[in-house]
């Protein structure tokens, strides 16, 4: 017999449907969120997208990367299929690597309003140069909670680096 959680899914559009690959470029409208059932328990979500592609804004040459988004949800979590569609929207989008990484951070924080979010753009070498871009943002919260979140993130970074992720 199949059992089911009480996760709210009625409002999700992308999951369970044929995957549309947007031609219009990245937009927060592509991202969907669902309610975080554990807002009083800080935990970290890490999503890696190893098939990221975009285009150089000068040469039009393809750039390849692994994009890693890490966040501590507050009231919302990102739905993973919508995240995949959002990542694919960069495929024919021309932008610098630094702009891409910061755009993803801005879009994720706009959509989710997480307590903390970090985006790592781990770009494949091109022309003999490898570029890694890290951008992060903490949500404004009361000082005691802010320190607890910073401690948690610091521990996460130490632990995560130990595993090479």
UniProtKB/Swiss-Prot annotation:
GO molecular function, one term: preQ1 synthase activity
Chief location of this protein within or outside the cell: cytoplasm
Keywords from the named record: Cytoplasm, NADP, Oxidoreductase, Queuosine biosynthesis
Enzyme class: oxidoreductase
Domain of life: Bacteria
Annotated residues for binding of substrate: 78-80, 97-98
Renumbered residue ranges of the record's region Disordered: 1-24
Subcellular location: Cytoplasm
EC id: 1.7.1.13
Transmembrane segments: none
Keyword Repeat (UniProt): no
Reactions this protein catalyses: 7-aminomethyl-7-carbaguanine + 2 NADP(+) = 7-cyano-7-deazaguanine + 2 NADPH + 3 H(+)
Presence of the UniProt keyword Repressor in the record: no
Family per similarity comment: Belongs to the GTP cyclohydrolase I family. QueF type 1 subfamily.
Identification of the protein by name: NADPH-dependent 7-cyano-7-deazaguanine reductase
